[in-house]
């Protein structure tokens, strides 16, 4: 306890005792016995230790200023850490974005290489198929050219029929092109468009069915032609052998 507080406390005790004494004086009571009374005096402050209230106030102000400065420093330190964390977060986001862009670029390059490789393989297969087909056609032509004159005439007739079929096919395409009408559907409502779509679907289904039937017929015809060619080859060989056996010494046996 400071000296000032001791002085104040002593004064308060002294005043309380005086009030008690005054109350006792006013109350009617029998004359008390005389006792020696103790005289209370306020404690004296030493001359060398005077209390400076201005100094105490300054110390309190300095303490408040120090606490306020500590709060300000703490606030700015927290703000600085938040800004550093925000900058680090932005850097991580930019880094992740750059990594994602690099991954997409690498993926696009790989996809481009894959597409180029597929296109190259497709072109190579088509070239091999075309070469194989050309070789097969050449072999067929050589095999057919080695046949007899009768078979050559048969081929000529077959080519003539094929030419007629091709001419008929071209004529058919021309007729179909002339018969084909433009599809005017701008003025149709939803129900009519649905009916028109169903009609076109049925027509396409019918065409596919006819195409399948014609394809099967062509396959059967090709098989029959191939069978006839094999029979002609066998007959030509048999006729050559029979002619060699029947003629002896320049005259028939």
Curated annotation (Swiss-Prot):
The record's keywords, sorted A to Z, are: Acetylation, Muscle protein, Phosphoprotein
One Pfam family recorded for the sequence: Troponin
In the record, which positions carry N-acetylserine? 2
Map out region (Disordered) in residue numbers. Answer: 1-58, 97-178
Q: Name one GO molecular function term.
A: troponin C binding
Compositional bias ranges of the Acidic residues kind: 1-25
Task: Name the residue ranges with Basic and acidic residues bias.
Answer: 46-58, 97-139, 167-178
Q: Which GO terms describe its biological process?
A: regulation of muscle contraction; sarcomere organization; skeletal muscle contraction
Task: Identify the domain of life.
Answer: Eukaryota
Q: Which GO terms describe its cellular component?
A: troponin complex
Assigned protein family: Belongs to the troponin T family.
The job of this chain, per UniProt, is described as: Troponin T is the tropomyosin-binding subunit of troponin, the thin filament regulatory complex which confers calcium-sensitivity to striated muscle actomyosin ATPase activity.
> What is the protein name stated in its UniProt record?
Troponin T, fast skeletal muscle isoforms
């Amino acid at each position: 306890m400071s000296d000032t507080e001791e002085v104040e406390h002593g004064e308060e005790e002294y005043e309380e005792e005086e009030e008690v004494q005054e109350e006792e004086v006013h109350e009617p009571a029998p004359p008390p016995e005389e006792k020696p009374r103790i005289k209370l005096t306020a404690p004296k402050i030493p001359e060398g230790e005077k209390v400076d209230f201005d100094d105490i106030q300054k110390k309190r102000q300095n303490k408040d200023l120090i606490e306020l400065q500590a709060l300000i420093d703490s606030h700015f330190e927290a703000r600085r850490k938040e800004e550093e964390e925000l900058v680090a977060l932005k850097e991580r986001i930019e880094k992740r974005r750059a990594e994602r862009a690099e991954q997409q670029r690498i993926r696009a390059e790989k996809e481009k290489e894959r597409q180029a490789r597929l296109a190259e393989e497709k072109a190579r297969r088509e070239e091999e198929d075309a070469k194989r087909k050309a070789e097969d056609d050449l072999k067929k032509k050589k095999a057919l050219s080695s046949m007899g004159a009768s078979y050559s005439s048969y081929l000529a007739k077959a080519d003539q029929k094929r030419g007629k079929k091709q001419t008929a096919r071209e004529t058919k395409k021309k007729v179909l092109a002339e018969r084909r009408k433009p599809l005017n559907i701008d003025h149709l409502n939803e129900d009519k468009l649905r009916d028109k779509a169903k009609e076109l679907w049925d027509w396409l289904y019918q065409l596919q069915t006819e195409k399948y039937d014609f394809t099967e017929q062509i396959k059967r015809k090709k098989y029959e032609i191939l069978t006839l060619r094999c029979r002609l080859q066998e007959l030509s060989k048999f006729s050559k052998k029979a002619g060699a056996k029947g003629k002896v010494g320049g005259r028939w046996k």
